[in-house]
Regions:
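Long alpha-helical, hydrophobic tracts
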Residues: 31-39, 52-60, 98
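Catalytic-site signature of metal-activated, phosphate-bearing donor transferases
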Residues: 2-16, 94-103, 110-125, 131-135, ...
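Short hydrophobic segments within beta-strands
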Residues: 26-28, 53, 241
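Short, conserved active-site loop motifs that form the nucleotide-linked donor/cofactor pocket
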Residues: 23, 82-85, 159
Length: 302
């Protein structure tokens, strides 16, 4: 049973008033016990809400999997402000699951209700829709030192969508792919009311227009039309641990649960295992990664 005393505190009401830009995070997590708490840490203070979507014991193809402690990690996470929403639902499509939760968060359920004793302002504050959604997977970790600058950049530019670039890591946090060769890059922020067409793609026409207009020297024209921008690397990046796993077996299991199996033929694993990387000393990693609660195997010494 919830502690109703929290609903009578001034601090609770102030929480809903104090943040000018409201950001609600949407995180999809399936067997991510090693990452989920560390994903929440750098964003918690900057979000009005955080939805963790999981199917618990199924992947998006309806196949049974052995669940790990992901849900327990979410339930055990310190959440004094009641921001974290754990969503356990049987979905069969990644895009639809993300859009469904975004739509649910946007619905103001506080309208036209009669309360049972809770301050109406608190109910309205809880259901106040966000300005933006932060979209990330459970293995996309932001730098706690630079995430505020990313939010400030978002608030300044006011785009309809903003892509975030991320470093890729392989097996351990010390094996990083040079960003000059490749960066993990997806929409990290989308304006409330905008939904996805496929996975992290908002509108395929953006890339089509960019491709056509590149022929006349306007490669970003489609992005301009849709008011989509990229967050500059110097402002902030995230750290993609998609291939950081305890061993090769767990990496294979991770890849088999992806919703984009068509992009992972058998030779893909070998390509991952043979990737060139630069050794990154642990002291040069974000402080929240350095001090995170990780398995010992996630770090190595040169």
């Amino acid at each position: 049973m919830p502690n109703n005393n929290i609903y009578s505190t001034v601090e609770k009401l102030n929480h809903f008033k104090q943040k000018e830009l409201r950001i609600h995070a949407i995180i999809i997590a399936l067997n991510e016990e090693d990452f989920i708490a560390e994903t929440i840490k750098p964003i918690y203070d900057h979000c009005s809400g955080i939805s963790i979507i999981t199917q618990y014991d199924r992947d998006y193809y309806g196949r049974m999997i052995e669940p790990d402690a992901t849900i327990k990690k979410v339930l055990d996470y310190p959440d004094p402000e009641g921001k974290i929403h754990l969503v356990v639902r049987r979905y069969n499509d990644e895009t639809a699951s993300r859009n469904h939760e975004m739509n649910a968060v946007l619905f103001d359920a506080s309208k036209n209700i009669q309360t049972h004793g809770v301050d109406k302002a608190l109910i309205q504050g809880f259901h106040k829709p966000p300005d933006y959604f932060l979209i990330c997977d459970a293995d996309e970790i932001f730098d706690i030192a630079t995430f505020p600058a990313i939010v400030e950049y978002l608030e300044k530019k006011k785009p309809d969508g903003m892509r975030i670039s991320g470093y890729n890591y392989y097996f351990t946090w010390n094996r990083r792919e040079p960003r000059e060769k490749y960066v993990h890059r997806h929409f990290g922020f989308v304006k409330a009311g905008i939904f996805f067409q496929q996975r992290r793609v908002i509108n395929w026409n953006e890339s089509r227009i960019n491709k056509w207009m590149a022929k006349i020297g306007l490669p970003k024209f489609g992005s301009y039309v849709y008011n989509f921008i990229d967050c500059p690397w110097e402002v902030g990046m995230m750290h993609h641990a998609g291939y950081v796993r305890r061993d090769k077996t767990q990496l294979i299991e991770k890849m088999q649960k992806h919703s984009h199996l068509e992009a992972h033929p058998p030779e893909f694993l070998e390509a991952i295992l043979s990737k060139e990387y630069e050794f990154t000393d642990s002291k040069n990693l974000p402080i929240n990664i350095q001090k995170g609660n990780w398995p010992d195997s996630f770090f190595e010494k040169k």
